[in-house]
Each structure stands twice: as C-alpha cells, then as structure tokens.
From Swiss-Prot:
Keyword Acyltransferase tagged: no
Keyword match Cytoplasm: yes
Organism: Ehrlichia ruminantium (strain Welgevonden)
Gene name of this polypeptide: gpsA
Keywords, comma-separated and alphabetical: Cytoplasm, Lipid biosynthesis, Lipid metabolism, NAD, NADP, Nucleotide-binding, Oxidoreductase, Phospholipid biosynthesis, Phospholipid metabolism
GO biological process, one term: glycerophospholipid metabolic process
EC number(s) stated in the UniProt entry for this protein: 1.1.1.94
Catalysis performed (reactions): sn-glycerol 3-phosphate + NAD(+) = dihydroxyacetone phosphate + NADH + H(+); sn-glycerol 3-phosphate + NADP(+) = dihydroxyacetone phosphate + NADPH + H(+)
InterPro entries documented for this protein: 6-PGluconate_DH-like_C_sf, 6PGD_dom2, G3P_DH_NAD-dep, G3P_DH_NAD-dep_C, G3P_DH_NAD-dep_N, NAD(P)-bd_dom_sf
The protein's name: Glycerol-3-phosphate dehydrogenase [NAD(P)+]
Upper classification of the organism: Bacteria, Pseudomonadati, Pseudomonadota, Alphaproteobacteria, Rickettsiales
Amino acid sequence: MKISILGAGSFGTAIAIALSAHGISVNLWGRDHRNTTHINTYRKNLKYLPTYHLPDNIYATSNIDEVLSDNNTCIILTIPTQQLRTICTQIQHKQHMCKNTPILICSKGIEITSLKFPSEIAEEILQYNPIFILSGPSFAKEIAEHLPCSIVLAGDNKELGESLIEKISNDVLKIIYHQDIIGVQIGAALKNIIAIACGIIAGKNLGNNAVATVITKGMNEIKTLYIAKNHSIDLHTLIGPSCLGDLILTCTTEHSRNMAFGLEIGKGRNINTLIDHNLKLVEGTSTVKPLISLAKKLNVELPICISIYNLLHENISLDKAISNILS
C-alpha cells in the first residue's frame, strides 16, 4: 500500500512516520528540494523534526509529479489553508494521474479570499476526488514518538471513509468516522483563536479559573457558528475529538503554538513583532480575519474571536481585550 503526503512540515512528517512504521510506503512532498534531499540521505527532517528518524519506506521529493499517481490509496494534504487552493489546482492539472483518489485534508482554518473551509475549497476544484477531513487533537512531536491520538475522518462517503480507516488507522493514529465534515472544520478553525485568548489570560497570570472560563465560552462560540453554518448540530461532533478534544489540547499547553503566542502577548511582548515572527506558524492569526467576516455574513456574535481580532488588527489595548474576553 502506498500513500502520498503533500506537505513536509512537522505534521506531514509525523504522519509519514506513523504510517510508515506500520508497513505503508509513503511519498512525502515538500517545496524545499534541499530539505527533501536531506531526508532521503540522512533519514531526518532537520528543518522541522530534527530529532526523529524517518524509516526507509518514506521517500521525500520536491517534484509533485512523483507523488501524484493512480496507485495511491489516498493523498493526504498537510499544508496551510491559505496555500490549499494552489495545491488543489496543481492536483487538478494532474487529474489523469490521480483521478478518483481520495484526498484527506489536515488543513485548519478559513480561506481569506473566499471565506471557505478547506473541504469547500477542495470540492470546488477537485470534482472527481472524494474529499475527507482528517482532524483532531494531535501534536506532531507526540505522533512522531508513536504516542496515541484519537482523530476524526469526516466526509460524505461513509463506506469509503470506513474503508480508509481500516487501512490507515493503527495504534498511534486511532481514527473514527464522522459524516459532519463542516462541523469538524468549525471546531478546528475556532480552537486556534480561542487558544490565543487562553494564552493571553495565562500570560497575564489571571489563573486557571479564568482559562477554564475562556474554554467554556469558546466552546459556546464554536456551537454558535456551527448552528449558523450547518443549520443543525451533531453532539457527537461537538463533544468529540475534533471540537472539544482539540479545543482542550490547544488551549491548555504551551506546546500549542497558538496558546504560546497568546502567552507572549499576555506577558507584554509587542504584538506586531510576534505576528511578524509567527505568521506562518500560528494558524489563529491567519484565521481570525476571515472568521470575523464569515460571522458577520452569518449574523452571529463571537465575543472572544472579535476581541482577538480587535487586539491583533484594530489596536485595542490588551486590558480592553481581556475585559471583553472575560465579560
């Protein structure tokens, strides 16, 4: 069995390690030719996960043609949401090589230009490929260390989804199926912004009670947007790994880049400097603008999310933002 992963960052590399350890051949694509060559030569991704060994059945390449073929069990995309349209277009141009191959998307967030979630972007472009979302509480380093996580595969085709789970689920990647593909992505997008808020509260030393308050209020904001977008709610999604589980993980540890980013803000670091240094790594900073635009379009209020937006982009004071978050 062969699987291709597009995105040779921390998460893509960790998924490759977890799959290859269970006998799956993995093609790992990344833009940086020097890095992919180094992976093949030294069996380490020095750029992103330098301390972890990559098994020999992982082949890295910067040539996208090498990873798009009709004998892939699936193609997994582990790239930032704002780059997803470009990559999907490249796949679409190679449809003769991978038509009907399932696409599993790990991207989290909302596209700035269209206000679309990752699955909506992919479905717009890749009309012949079954689209799934793979999401849940899953730090790359823990996956690379073969520690277990529970994640969700969401998509419309239940039979195909469950078949994929049988093939790729293992003692590290414990995967369950959901049909609620939009609900899963709402939780994945909002949790990063809520984690920034939790980091700010922790950085200001306002206590664990206040952090718990933000998590609780944040869960309500996920539910609010969920109902507005989906016109219904699936409790299995809301209290499952992709919403509640990912929210708890992202909001309660400094290993979360979004929480750590908020922590530095709470400690008084310059916000613009932090954004400049972390824009590509902290998903919440790129998600908050389109999220607020989507909330306005759907006529819903998300107090925590608008507070973070105003803090990052409208120059309100930190104390005012904290007051709004906790009010």
